[in-house]
Amino acid sequence: MQANGGTEMIKAVIFDMDGTLVDTERLGIKAWKAGAAELGLAIDDALIHQFIGRTLVDVMGILEERYGSHEIAEAIYVRHKEIRDEMVKTELELKAGAAECLDELLAAGYHVGLATSSRHVTAERNLKAFGLFDKFETVTCGEDVVHGKPDPEMYLLACKRAGFAPEECAVVEDSRNGCVSGITAGCHVFAVPDIVPLPQDVVDGCDAVLDTLFELTAAVKDVR
């Protein structure tokens, strides 16, 4: 674990979902590639990595720019979603320490919130599969904001819904886009990198970079 420390007492912990709590990013990569291939198109890892932490509107914009057609972008997205939804039914797994750290934080009296670029129906489905959705006291999803991550709007709204100032809130993220959103919002940011390593400038802006969520509660409590 790398830690930079902090100055304000944390009262709320707000989690990203995809790649942070549930291992959806790997399934998503497989689904994007399979969906594109069925349409006779290629899609590379570098493009898919741009989707991580983004809202559907942003993802569609990236696809349209790459393929030059709204119809092609929509076809790839629709087929990818069909494939991914089937995979989620049998292959979705929790990230290590997800359930344990939620229980620890709630027991310690922290407000626990969710801030995900996924739509509400997707977040509810994926987290209810593991009995976690009802643990979140506030939920902010992709359809709740105009500007998705890395814009700070989602975390500013999540802090407002939690009832705390950004400097009283910790953000838990796996991706560059998510971390930048939390940092720009003025929150404490704890990163647990998933598929794509974080660039050094993002690492420098985080309070801590953790190996797993098992380390999170102690790291949050260490901020004074």
Labelled PLM ranges:
Residues 2-11, 103-106, 119-224:
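Asp-based, Mg2+/Mn2+-dependent phosphohydrolase catalytic module
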Residues 5-49:
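Active-site neighborhood of HAD-like aspartate-dependent phosphohydrolases
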Residues 16, 42-43, 55, 165, ...:
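Short coil/turn motifs that cap or connect alpha-helices
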Residues 20, 116-118:
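Conserved phosphate-coupling serine/threonine residues in phosphotransfer and NTP-handling enzymes
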Residues 21, 94, 112, 147, ...:
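Conserved SAM-binding loop
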Residues 27, 51-55, 93-97, 118, ...:
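Short beta->alpha linker loops
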Residues 35-36, 55-69, 126, 158-159:
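Helix-loop "lid/cap" segments that line or gate small-molecule binding pockets
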Residues 42, 47, 64-100, 108-110:
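Metal-dependent phosphoesterase signature
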